[in-house]
Amino acid sequence: MLKRCLWLVVTVLFAWQVFNGTAIAAQLDATTRTVALNDQGKNITLSRRQVEDGQRLFNEACASCHAGGITKTNPSLDLSPETLALATPRRDSVAGLVDYMKDPTTYDGEDSIAEIHPSIKSADIYPKMRNLSEQDLTAIAGYILVQPKVQGEKWGGGKIYF
């Protein structure tokens, strides 16, 4: 009898987590969803839908190389706020990340790397980028900027966290 009760409790808890776990995680408050829009100090509060779309699009187009905010091809350049802020031009805003996704440059901003990094400019080489609209790029950028607030130092922290 005790064994049946334990199995029932485990099943109920598992079912509750499956059906409610993602809904709870998706409820980000406005402060968490507020990120830098540009370098001039303007902010934008993303809708929950934008963050959800950003996550989906990031997973489809970016996560194969940037899962967890890392960069598989260059582990010293992650998607953490500090790394994005030190890039030239700065990439720690929605506008900066959208600009990068359109035409990526080296970390110092000197050279275009569109031929070796997926972008709108190189959509003929990277089909995952072909159908991304300006709104999609904004959602992806917003998702990238929200993640450090949600995951903390795990975002961009590397394999020690995964």
Curated annotation (Swiss-Prot):
It comes from Cyanothece sp. (strain PCC 7425 / ATCC 29141). One of its GO terms (biological process) is photosynthesis, light reaction. The gene is psbV. One of the extrinsic, lumenal subunits of photosystem II (PSII). PSII is a light-driven water plastoquinone oxidoreductase, using light energy to abstract electrons from H(2)O, generating a proton gradient subsequently used for ATP formation. The extrinsic proteins stabilize the structure of photosystem II oxygen-evolving complex (OEC), the ion environment of oxygen evolution and protect the OEC against heat-induced inactivation. Low-potential cytochrome c that plays a role in the OEC of PSII. PSII is composed of 1 copy each of membrane proteins PsbA, PsbB, PsbC, PsbD, PsbE, PsbF, PsbH, PsbI, PsbJ, PsbK, PsbL, PsbM, PsbT, PsbX, PsbY, PsbZ, Psb30/Ycf12, peripheral proteins PsbO, CyanoQ (PsbQ), PsbU, PsbV and a large number of cofactors. It forms dimeric complexes. It is a peripheral membrane protein. Heme c binds at C62, C65, H66, H117. Coiled coil: none annotated. This is Photosystem II extrinsic protein V.
